[in-house]
């Protein structure tokens, strides 16, 4: 298979030994950049493709070393408070290298497919019985050429592949990627299109069209459904999830994902606010009834992850 491993993309990181991003033990590549702006996003640093400055104030010990190495006046200390002037930041990263408590970070780095494959192949021993590579985000379709090249490189080595996608992208990109993807972890967030736009920034028509496309191509799909209190936890949405599973034989499983508030702290570290600011975790046990409700209506496995 022809493949260009010199293609580069923008990622957040590569995580190893992941167990919730597809079957088996997986190496998950988190790309940067997403066309959606989900109000509850737990990885807000993945929304913009640009490199971004993150300051975790709760970790800062006020040592002041960052201010001494920064030549742009980003850091200042007054009355025991560490102030960060993001407008002055040039993203040089010097301060992050001096911070020994991980309070400072530049989110985003450029990397080639070849460099990622070096990490993937180092993990290959764990893929012998199950597992593989998952491309997540952000949104893999947002960097479609890079995603295609990485999938091609994995298939050249016989490695199982998944992508986690919101489904918002060009049909031609999805068709190419589907030929190389063993499993789509396809997000289904909201049934009502107007509410979908309110909470994610886009309507859901294109997403549903692309779900239909990959299902008619015979792709293997796991429908992943974030459960967000006061947003989509209602019988209308549960019934729609079941209807999709019954409509498309390509949908092999349904995964319910309980809300967690980790994204709130990340948004603060980026200098933003979070539109959905529920601070309590949704416990897995709180979804037992939802899981049973949907399972009674479908023939595929439904589980909370």
Where does each model-flagged region fall?
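Extended, non-globular alpha-helical segments
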Residues: 55-61, 108-123
């Amino acid at each position: 298979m022809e493949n260009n491993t010199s293609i580069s993309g923008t990622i957040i990181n590569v995580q190893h030994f992941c167990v919730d991003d597809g079957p088996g033990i997986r190496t998950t590549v988190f790309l940067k950049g997403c066309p959606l702006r989900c109000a509850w996003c737990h990885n807000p640093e993945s929304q913009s493709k640009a490199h971004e400055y993150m300051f975790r104030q709760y970790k800062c010990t006020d040592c002041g070393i960052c201010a001494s190495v920064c030549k742009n006046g980003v850091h200042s200390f007054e009355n025991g408070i560490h102030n960060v002037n993001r407008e002055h930041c040039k993203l040089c990263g010097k301060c992050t290298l001096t911070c020994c408590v991980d309070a400072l970070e530049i989110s985003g780095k450029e990397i080639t497919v070849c460099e990622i494959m070096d990490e993937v192949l180092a993990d290959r021993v764990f893929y012998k019985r199950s597992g593989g590579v998952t491309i997540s985000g952000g949104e893999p379709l947002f960097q479609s050429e890079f995603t295609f090249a990485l999938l091609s490189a994995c298939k050249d080595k016989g490695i199982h592949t998944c992508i986690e996608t919101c489904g918002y992208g060009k049909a031609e990109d999805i068709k190419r990627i589907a030929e190389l993807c063993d499993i789509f972890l396809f997000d289904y967030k909201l049934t009502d299109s107007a509410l979908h736009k309110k909470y994610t920034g886009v309507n859901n028509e294109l997403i549903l069209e692309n779900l239909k496309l990959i299902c008619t191509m015979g792709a293997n799909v796991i429908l992943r459904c974030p459960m967000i209190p006061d947003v989509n936890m209602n019988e209308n949405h549960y019934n729609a999830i079941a209807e999709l599973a019954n409509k498309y034989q390509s949908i092999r499983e349904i995964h319910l994902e309980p809300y967690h508030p980790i994204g709130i702290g990340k948004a603060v570290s980026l200098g933003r606010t979070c539109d959905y600011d529920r601070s309590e975790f949704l416990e897995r046990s709180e979804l037992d009834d939802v899981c049973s409700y949907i399972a009674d209506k479908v023939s595929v496995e439904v589980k909370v992850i």
